[in-house]
Amino acid sequence: YGIYGDVARGDNDYQIILRYDREELKKYERPLDQKAPHQSGPEQPDAKIFVFTGNTVYGVQNLEYDAASQKWLMAVYHGQKSTFSNPPMFWFDGQKAPVEKAIKESGERHLVIEPVGTSAFTYGQTGICALGEGLFYISHDGADGEKQFSDIYLYQMTDGENPDFQRV
């Protein structure tokens, strides 16, 4: 989750990822009943991880782990603060653990992960799926009058410190 939209605030430049123990979550499993959805679950997450992205609109749209590159990909909508470049894609090292440190503006100490790279790649907010071997299905959203749609394309991740995507 995140606090976003208010460009006057200085404490809304992080996304917050809640971490839960997958094994512990099993005791809350229930069959889906659309007429009476359950709301069971743990009282608290195991951890809150703050991810510095700068201000974004609507927070994280897609978070995907790519086992081939061992990176997390985070797709967001551009933010509105002029102090940030507001890239739509962030990369995080999947092998680095978050570290406790003071977050900007408030000085409060939290678990924090910093991005290892960014990309100006403008798709992925409405869908991204790692397929392995550097291949991804990535959504291109659009609108035709009142109808919204998404086309899915196959992409290859480029190599390097700050990878990008090439359509296959």
Residue ranges, per PLM feature:
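Blade-level signature of beta-propeller repeat domains, shared across WD40, Kelch, NHL, RCC1
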Residues: 125-168
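Beta-propeller blade signature
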Residues: 10-33, 85-105, 149-167
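Residue-level signature of beta-propeller blades and closely related beta-rich strand-turn architectures
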Residues: 3-7, 77-80, 141-144
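Loop/turn-rich, solvent-exposed surfaces of beta-rich toroidal or solenoidal domains
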Residues: 49-118, 126
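Entry beta-strands of beta-propeller and related beta-repeat scaffolds
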Residues: 1, 69-74, 134-138
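Hydrophobic, aliphatic-enriched repeat segments that assemble into extended interaction scaffolds
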Residues: 1-4, 64-66, 129
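Eukaryote-skewed repeat-based solenoidal scaffolds used as protein-protein interaction platforms
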Residues: 1-60
